């Protein structure tokens, strides 16, 4: 077939889906925070932002990183001996005493629910070996996550260091990562906790979770005299997971609910590419054989049209493949999803064989499909 005379061929399919109008979101959402952001927890797409890259003091939302490192240390069931240094830490506390023996898990709950600064230091000393060692781990993790405008100097966020700062954007990145950890999800979303190794019962300070917002799934509060009110919160509704961050915001509860409600009202998750067979390959070598292993979804508004494209690139089939299927590579191409001329997803295309089986067909879909209702035929570029 002439269509295979080049090394690759590209199938480009355009869909009638809407364009994100960021200006519309900015006009509809007005927050009092100095910095703010709300992102899709699945894709990381920024849905609204205000000075999101401005470096600012962040107060106790610092403790999200402290919790992440404690959880990932694998030491949650270990017993921590509380130091005098931890006990002397000023500010909010869970009232530890010197020499007290507490399970690390209890300290992390006290850190997240009651914002215990003493717990933060006890965690840091146990997990990092010392405060300096733990701070090094915090900054190393921040670098790994791409938090380019963040610098940690302590595990709690107190104003004792000039160069302790982050941004709304970076804290959203951190929280997106943290929410992938089951222990973090559970702790962050706990309303009341009874400590296992202390005579304490703690209620979460996050009023969105405990009182104000039915779709809240967790978060972390913060306040210092210099940072003012800071807040990270998460919410879920109808399969949409959101992350909101505000820094220096006197009306943070209201602003978070305002951002959440706007997104839940105007956005929905669309199925852009369905796992399994790739349409528009009829009459080709790859018909009924080329497939992707996962659904590709994206959060979009109803108004967004014509700005999502799928570029499917496949290897040119060789004559030897027709004679001996074992010579066909496992991965024969890739599917690239473009939105507003930017790549939002790129997944490998597999050729069905004994090692790679197509996903089973699903009879029910949870997402609104735009892939199956594509307008027009395929455009071939050779």
Swiss-Prot record:
One of its GO terms (molecular function) is serine-type D-Ala-D-Ala carboxypeptidase activity. The keyword Hydrolase applies. The active site is at residues 60, 63, 115. GO terms for cellular component: membrane. It is found in: Forespore outer membrane. It is an enzyme of class 3 (hydrolase). Optimum pH is 7-8.5. It comes from the Bacteria. It catalyses: Preferential cleavage: (Ac)2-L-Lys-D-Ala-|-D-Ala. Also transpeptidation of peptidyl-alanyl moieties that are N-acyl substituents of D-alanine. Residues 1-27 form the signal peptide. Pathway: Cell wall biogenesis; peptidoglycan biosynthesis. InterPro entries: Beta-lactam/transpept-like, Peptidase_S11, Peptidase_S11_C, Peptidase_S11_N. It is a peripheral membrane protein. This is D-alanyl-D-alanine carboxypeptidase DacB. The gene is dacB.
